């Protein structure tokens, strides 16, 4: 049986589906053809392909790639910051090498002496320039010496011949003949540019035309002023084309309100920064002054200590202290000879670590009775020679009457520790009549009455009250 004549078992629904699919394909073909004719290309068809085993990635590859990208970004940021820091340091170093310091006090913070480096660099440049000039002069002399004495032969090409000419400024020039036309053209252009000035350009306009231009400019400014909202009138609004120069202290603010406020804020911020820097500078100066004064005070203390050890304490105090001096014992006079009988001298040694003029008391000497003499001080010659105009005010000595009384006394030792059998007790403990006499000699200055002490404790308590 022939296959072509064999009937096909096809249902009606399948035939309808086939016709519908055929019709849809025909319509798609017609649409594509129309789009091609009109010049519009349709979207390419997307083909859904199954991913192959080669396109499949390993687990965690994308995460590692993201981490690497983040790490590269962080490294790039760190590198950019380091580059910015290095550029800032390079600019700062370049400024310092040129001598442009931010502040004079900042110069002391650095270990490098940039001022000396600038001086050395200039000296080196001057030396190298002088050496180079001397070398050039030597080479020029050598070339002149090596030139032949004969005449220089003329050039083979006449265009290479040297010619002299005078430019528009009256200067004598020398060039090759082939370059002469170009140089003359340049000179002509330069001469024309020099003689055309802004003043000459203004003269090209008549007075009426200039007034008309000014009127038009004024009208434009008035229109802009009408468009702006009502507000305060500033100097820049009425200045117009003023030719007066207002100096470096004048700042031209903008006419726009927002821009003007921004400029004023910036100017205020700069003023505050300047004030803060000035205050910091003053504080630094005060700290340095305080440190210097503390050092000087330490040096004075050391000097006083050395002078006390060397026995020149009184001279240093007279030179340093201003005002009323505390009572201090002066040079001990020679003891007067006792008329009644021989007496034992009691020498009191002063410790260097105690107050001057007050002897040190040992623990086993407290409460003992000694026949010490009395203090008698006389007025210092320096104070006597002093001009009353330069003396301290009298109010300083209101509560120091006893001090002045005791300052005119000197220490003497008239009595022994124990009296002789033939001597009266009042003579051994009391002063002699010649010492207690309040009537001074006609030639000697008046002396104050004496003060006697029975015990060492009485004497110390008295001098504590006095000093």
From Swiss-Prot:
Compositional bias (Polar residues): 425-437
Tissues where the protein occurs: Widely expressed.
Keyword set, alphabetical order: Coiled coil, Nucleus, Phosphoprotein
Protein name as catalogued: Coiled-coil domain-containing protein 174
Cellular location(s): Nucleus
Record's function text: Probably involved in neuronal development.
Superkingdom in the source lineage: Eukaryota
Region described as Disordered: spans on this chain: 40-77, 124-162, 299-363, 378-453
Species of the source: Homo sapiens
Biased composition annotated in UniProt, kind: Basic and acidic residues: 64-77, 124-139, 348-363, 378-389
Ranges of Pro residues composition bias in the record: 324-336, 439-448
């Amino acid at each position: 049986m022939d296959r072509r004549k064999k009937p096909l078992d096809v249902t009606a629904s399948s035939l309808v589906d086939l016709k519908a699919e055929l019709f849809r394909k025909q319509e798609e073909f017609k649409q594509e053809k129309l789009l091609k004719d009109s010049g519009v290309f349709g979207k390419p068809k997307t083909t859904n392909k199954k991913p192959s085993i080669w396109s499949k990635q390993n687990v965690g590859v994308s995460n590692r790639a993201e981490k690497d990208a983040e790490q590269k970004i962080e490294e790039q940021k760190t590198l950019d910051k380091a580059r910015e820091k290095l550029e800032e340091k390079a600019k700062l170093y370049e400024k310092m090498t040129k001598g442009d310091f931010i502040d004079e006090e900042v110069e002391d913070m650095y270990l490098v002496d940039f001022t000396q480096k600038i001086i050395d660099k200039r000296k080196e440049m001057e030396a190298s320039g002088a050496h180079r000039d001397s070398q050039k002069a030597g080479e020029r002399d050598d070339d002149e010496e090596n030139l032949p004495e004969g005449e220089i032969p003329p050039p083979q090409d006449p265009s290479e011949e040297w010619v002299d000419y005078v430019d528009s400024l009256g200067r004598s020039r020398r060039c090759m003949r082939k370059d002469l036309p170009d140089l003359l053209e340049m000179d002509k252009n330069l001469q024309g540019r020099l003689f055309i000035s802004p003043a000459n350009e203004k003269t090209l306009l008549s007075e009426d035309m200039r007034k008309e231009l000014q009127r038009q400019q004024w009208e434009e400014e008035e229109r802009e002023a009408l468009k702006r909202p009502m507000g305060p009138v500033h100097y820049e609004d009425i200045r117009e084309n003023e030719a007066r120069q207002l100096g470096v202290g004048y700042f031209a603010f903008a006419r726009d309100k927002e821009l003007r406020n921004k400029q004023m804020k910036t100017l205020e911020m700069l003023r505050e920064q300047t004030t803060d820097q000035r205050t910091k500078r003053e504080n630094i100066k005060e700290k340095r002054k305080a440190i210097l004064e503390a050092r000087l005070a330490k040096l004075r203390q050391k000097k006083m200590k050395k002078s006390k050890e060397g026995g020149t304490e009184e001279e240093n105090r007279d030179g340093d202290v201003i005002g009323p001096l505390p009572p201090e014992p002066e040079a001990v006079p020679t003891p007067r000879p006792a008329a009644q009988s021989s007496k034992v001298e009691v020498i009191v040694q002063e410790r260097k670590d105690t107050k001057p003029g007050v002897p040190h008391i040992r623990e086993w000497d407290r409460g003992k009775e000694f026949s010490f003499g009395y203090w008698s001080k006389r007025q210092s010659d320096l104070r006597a020679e002093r001009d009353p105009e330069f003396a301290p005010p009298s109010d300083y000595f209101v509560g120091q009457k006893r001090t002045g009384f005791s300052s005119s006394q000197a220490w003497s030792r008239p009595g022994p520790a124990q009296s002789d059998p033939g001597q009266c007790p009042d003579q051994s403990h009391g002063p002699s009549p010649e010492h207690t006499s309040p009537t001074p000699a006609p030639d000697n200055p008046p002396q104050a009455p004496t003060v006697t002490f029975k015990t060492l404790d009485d004497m110390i308590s008295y001098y504590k009250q006095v000093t």
